Design a protein with these regions (language model features):
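Conserved SET/PR domain catalytic loop and adjacent active-site segment
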Residues: 189-258
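Conserved, mostly hydrophobic/aromatic
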Residues: 40, 74, 100, 149, ...
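Alpha-helical segments flanking ligand/cofactor-binding loops in enzyme cores
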Residues: 14, 18, 38, 62, ...
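Alpha/beta enzyme core
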Residues: 34-46, 55-67, 85-99
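Catalytic alpha/beta core domains of metabolic enzymes, predominantly
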Residues: 80-194
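Catalytic beta/alpha-barrel core
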Residues: 26-33, 46-57, 70-78, 101-102, ...
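Single conserved hydrophobic/aromatic residue that forms the stacking wall/gate
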Residues: 1-8, 12
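Short, surface-exposed connector motifs at secondary-structure boundaries
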Residues: 18-24, 41-47, 65-72, 122-129
Length: 258
């Protein structure tokens, strides 16, 4: 959220964490110094966030990784070696619970600089989960990131975009945020599992009424040799499918076919 001081007291953090849990939300926070890491670790935070500007601070990342908690590393401004060094630092102390976020460190960021393909490339290159830290306006780039496999999305939230501060103008207000979440869930559901096993149960009626099956164009008497011009394909698709036509042509009718 916006407008909260980075010097928020330990008491405030505990209250905020408790409130999040009452809403079935996960309390997360970035940590930019050793003291903050230790405070958040004591709070038993679910994961620690490494901001983009701290990705080259390997001492800070090492201290985070040594907590054993999952780390979310934002990769704005980074090149491949920056990312590799950060990952190696975590793995060297036994922490492999990592998520890399593709990020463009502009506020706001124009969509054409979002480089969402990096979500897939980083996942394949480093063998870790990947997501997207979004600074664009609107929700369309976030939706696209899900289709590319983002499993974590960071989006700025504010109570009022007119508040003073660098992040408020491109952040989402609660109503917009809720709408984005509903659409994200739709996109997740729409991705499916990639299998193609024929019509789903919900499609059965369309399948039967829309597909065609083979029918006799004329009466075919018993004993007649079936020829191409005797057969047509018509709806509904409850009989012999058209792809079997070549197997039928040239056969002898074993009974009268109307």
């Amino acid at each position: 959220t916006q407008g909260v001081s980075s010097a928020a007291s330990d008491v405030y953090k505990r209250q905020l964490k408790k409130y999040c849990e009452s809403l079935n939300l996960i309390f997360l926070s970035s940590a930019c110094d050793i003291e903050a890491i230790d405070e958040l670790d004591e709070l038993e935070i679910a994961a620690l966030k490494v901001p983009s500007c701290e990705l080259s601070d390997l001492g800070l990342i090492r201290h985070m990784a040594q907590t054993g908690r999952p780390l979310i590393l934002s990769t704005g401004l980074a090149d491949w070696m920056d990312i590799q060094r950060a990952i190696d630092t975590c793995r060297d102390v036994g922490n492999r619970n990592l998520v890399l976020l593709q990020c463009t460190s502009l506020y706001p960021a124009p969509p054409h600089l979002s480089n969402l393909e990096a979500i897939k490339v980083m996942r394949d290159a480093f063998g870790v989960l990947t997501g997207y830290s979004d600074h664009t306006e609107g929700n369309h780039v976030c939706l696209a990131s899900v289709a590319l496999g983002a499993c974590v999305i960071e989006k700025h939230l504010t109570l009022d975009r007119k508040l003073v501060g660098p992040d408020h103008p491109f952040s989402m207000e609660p109503t917009q945020f809720k709408e984005m979440m509903l659409r994200l869930r739709d996109v997740e559901a729409a991705l499916g599992d990639g299998t193609k096993t024929g019509p789903r149960s919900e499609e059965r009626e369309v399948f039967e009424q829309g597909r065609r099956s083979l029918h006799a164009k004329i009466r075919i008497p018993k004993g007649a040799v079936i020829k191409r011009e005797m057969i047509t394909a018509k709806r509904p698709g409850l009989g012999i499918p058209p792809y079997l036509l070549d197997l039928i042509i040239g056969r002898v009718a074993r009974s009268d076919i109307e």
